[in-house]
Amino acid sequence: MALQDLRTYYDSVEKEDFNSLLNQRCLVTEKIQASSLHVRREDDGLKFYKSGNKQPLNKIDRTIVSYYERGIGHFDALIKEKIDEMPMDWKFGFDYMINEKTVDIEYDTLPKNNLILTHIQVLNEDRTQIRKVIRDPRILEKWADILEVQSPEVIFEGILADYQKEKLINILSLQGEQARMKFEDFTFSYHAFKVFNESTHKAMLNNDIHKDIDGLVVSFLEGKTLKNFKLQSPLKEAKEVEPRKSSDAYQ
């Protein structure tokens, strides 16, 4: 499911409603520009799903689109005991990368075994619907360790301080020439990281926080509802308005 843009949400709601959102418990991780790969254990072995597809990849798919073979090969190489630990009603969602250079971002490194565990879908009894989505960083870290992949790095977790809220609103208010001037000396990536964690000096797959990133995932817990947003540069958003050819690797 696509993430709602935080800037769009900020522009569309009343100030009081947005401030109320900022008062909720917050979790921030980096948004990686990568492919999506889902994995689920069934009676006859693991099934692999591309992007948002409900049908698993079959042998013909894998022959035509060999892009996913490195990721699939990683799971084929895991010991049986680790595979057997995977609950059959859980569908594990991963960011998947085989090259440091993506559509318009060049990272310094690749994730562990090319995979980042970003979420886990808990399915209903007949496995046709998603009952809930697990994004708890502690659960993801545990399963990433079991499956020998990377887990999301938590940039911030807790209640935002007033100065953080002010910095965030300042970034969300920027657009056009004002944004270009703001990010001329220090990039959007630098400013975004510093909103949530002033001691951060390294991005998830970059050696510093000055290089471009795809954005941040900013989540707020309202009661029992988790609201997930993407925070991206207004310059990137303006560029994405222009149509471009889709790439199977980044759907």
Which residue stretches match the model-derived regions?
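Core nucleotide-handling region used for phosphoryl-transfer chemistry
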Residues: 1-251
